[in-house]
């Protein structure tokens, strides 16, 4: 995940030699049912979870049969999807209390690799009672989201009843990942884009941004929000 490198540091007046930690970046070739899809750079952890989360959240597959990781090649086998965004109508039955939102936001995130290098994003999953399920760091925010989605799927969680909290801004492609995987609630310390808000509104996704220091903004609520 990280490694030491030798650097020259300038302190505003002098240079001096020292060692510092940097993030490890690996490039992986992604295949769906043997067909090359794309190459991605990511941290070399939770690769099986990434494979499952990526294939589902990007709409390539709706059922995973097998994942093979061979060095820098990741091959995902399963049933194909038509890649259309699924309308997440079932989320109308999901309610969440403001106290649970407060609990999740107040949960202390220990992003050790980010603290050491400043080079990582993180993503986490919580249940509707505000309990933490999984936490992952990665050099890419989309990768981190895919990894926690994949973890939830592999461990038989119902994603309709999970909450995604992560560190990056919320663009529309993150909302698409939520829709394709069945997530209904996204919380981030950063804001969403206008397209993300529109897409979340259309699909009844509860979108919360600027979740920091006990404060947050609600951008879309739909039928999810319970006063």
Swiss-Prot record:
This is Protein FdhD. Gene3D superfamilies: 3.10.20.10, Cytidine Deaminase, domain 2. HAMAP family: FdhD (MF_00187). One of its GO terms (cellular component) is cytoplasm. One of its GO terms (molecular function) is sulfurtransferase activity. It comes from the Archaea. Belongs to the FdhD family. Required for formate dehydrogenase (FDH) activity. It is found in: Cytoplasm. The keyword Cytoplasm applies. SUPFAM superfamilies: Cytidine deaminase-like. The keyword Methyltransferase does not apply.
